[in-house]
């Protein structure tokens, strides 16, 4: 996949969960049409419950809320959150849920590591932050330190397409929880800033090295 850079975006760097979750929760609270959220981990902690509550409130307002989590990273999601979310009208699924003990087999290592959110197809969040408190760590470890980017502008359409495609794939695979793909919100194509951005995905099949190649090309093209 060749990086398709789009001008006219506004990018906001969010430092760790301290900056990310207030921004995400505010965006969820303002949603009027649809929400897509993907996460490898959805922890049973204060942050997890704050996000779950915000999603439930959005669904109660009539917003289409779609949540996809990994079946190993969020292996307790089905018991910790699924009943509450589905009762509120949230559509939630697990990617490749693990049944029984996790034995090391190559095909079981294919996980959903993406951490993405798209709100009303107008603002997207991309980065490395799971739905988990920064301080939810063993006592002898430092808090998590990671970043996310808030994206507004034409580039949101690329992220929106990716989350809808993943929802379609996981829904097809979840025979007992198949959901019809609703008509999408219209991605915002209006200029939101002066920054150029491209969204790239990585997988172990067709796009294994796309991000690496984009890094190398960007470094080679650097002028300052």
What annotation goes with each model-predicted range?
Residues 1-224:
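Charged, low-complexity intrinsically disordered terminal segments
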């Amino acid at each position: 996949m060749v990086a398709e850079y789009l001008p006219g975006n506004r990018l906001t760097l969010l430092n760790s969960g301290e900056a990310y979750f207030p921004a995400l929760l505010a965006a969820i609270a303002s949603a009027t049409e649809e929400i897509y959220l993907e996460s490898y981990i959805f922890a049973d902690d204060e942050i997890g419950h704050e996000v779950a509550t915000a999603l439930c409130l959005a669904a109660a307002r009539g917003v289409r809320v779609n949540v996809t989590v990994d079946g190993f990273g969020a292996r307790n999601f089905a018991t910790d959150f699924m009943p509450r979310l589905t009762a509120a009208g949230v559509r939630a699924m697990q990617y490749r849920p693990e049944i029984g003990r996790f034995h090391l087999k190559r095909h079981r290592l294919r996980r959903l590591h993406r951490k993405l959110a798209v709100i009303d197809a107008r603002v997207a969040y991309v980065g490395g932050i799971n739905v988990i408190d920064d301080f939810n760590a063993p006592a002898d470890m430092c808090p998590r330190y990671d970043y996310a980017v808030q994206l507004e502008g034409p580039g949101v359409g690329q992220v929106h397409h990716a989350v809808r495609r993943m929802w379609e794939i996981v829904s097809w695979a979840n025979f007992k929880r198949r959901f019809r793909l609703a008509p999408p919100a219209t991605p915002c194509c209006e200029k939101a800033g002066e920054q150029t951005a491209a969204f790239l995905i990585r997988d172990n099949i067709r796009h294994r090295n796309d991000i690496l190649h984009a890094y190398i090309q960007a470094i080679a093209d650097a002028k300052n």
